[in-house]
Amino acid sequence: MSAIIGSGIFVVPAAIAGHLHSMGLIVLVWVLGGVLTLFGALTVAELSSLLPQAGGPYVYLRESFGRVWGYMFSWNHFFINTAGSLAAIAVAFATYLGYFFPSLSLQVPLFSFSFSVLGLPIEIALRGTQLIAMIVILIATLINVRGVRLGGWVTNFFTAAKVLALLALIVAVFTSTKGNSANYLPWWPDHWSKELTSAFGLAMISVLWSYEGWTTVTQSAGEMKDPERNIPRSLLFGTLAIIVLYLAVNMAYAYVIPLDQMSGSSRIAADAAAVVLGPFGTSLIIAGILCSTFGTINNSFLSDARSMYAAGADNSFSPSFGKIHARYRTPHVTLIALGVWSALLTLSGSYDQIASYVIFGSWMFYGLTALSVIVLRKKMPDVPRPYRAWAYPYATLIFVGAAGWILYNTLVEDSRDAMIGIVLLLISLPFYFYWKGRHEK
């Protein structure tokens, strides 16, 4: 659960309320996003039980479509998705920490410079928030270099803390006399239009950002006990629990904050807490948000670095990335590289732009990973599968179709950022053929 419950649920409900102005549509988009996530989780669960090696989707794509596709996934996942998400979430952590230490929120940069890439303006600036974000990433790097047991303990602790914070907010809201069920009206729009379809698509992208991380448990499968049994169970029950939790949180937000006011909130969870709990309650909720964001950062290090480690161990990338620390038995080179690159990305300080890259790259490979179930049933029909995908092939094909729609919608609605994501992915190919040539020699 820690891989999914990050900063999104504390940020994106306000943006979704700005796209969809009726509570029924907001509930619908969260349910559909959760169902898609569940379909994907149930699909990936078969792959993780079939091929329970460390590396997750890298291994699935390599066995299904060839080594180059596994490598491209690892590149995208490591340098764009994981590092970009870590940078954005670390900046969010530092921003919320500024509630308790206002001096950390100073917006005057210590240094800055600007440039453009394919017409996209980029500012590199070191402010107090970026400096704290770098320190947080450094701490998470050191924790995970020390070993899976320590990193896993930290993840479990912060998962419990943030779930308790969300549950406390839900209970406080619905037992308060300060809410109003009239805030749920209008429940449904008077008519459906082309503009509403576009808005629903944009809201869905925000929802899927909040559900990001559902595959990460499979990527440390080689280091887990009994992965054939534990991974499918974790995906199924964890995803269902998060769907219910997210729906309850959104209903709680809207119960105390009207939709037209919700869309203008930058700290929706804190604002909801302030209505029913006052300043002290706001402090508690922000403490929960800090636990949530740090737990997500730590979990990404714990699981996501394994894909590039698998590529290094497979000689599809620099062999240094496949090295294991002699004492701690962790992929320390990969973890340190991820920490350094993520820390550098915090200098951009752009949460929204990074999210666009992450969603586009993620769902391209999520769709291919789901297709791997079909391919591997043809290529490996006799290999034992302790778990088989539920409602196959219908749930799998629905998920693949949804991934295709998300890519199309991103290309149409946010074409510039989507093209930048494609270019960044294609940059990986020269490196692949270089390392492949060196290995063959």
Question: Model-flagged regions — what are they?
Answer:
Residues 1-24, 37-42, 51-54, 382, ...:
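Membrane-interface "cap" regions at the ends of multi-pass membrane proteins
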Residues 128-179, 235-236, 358-368, 395, ...:
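Membrane-interface loop-to-helix entry segments
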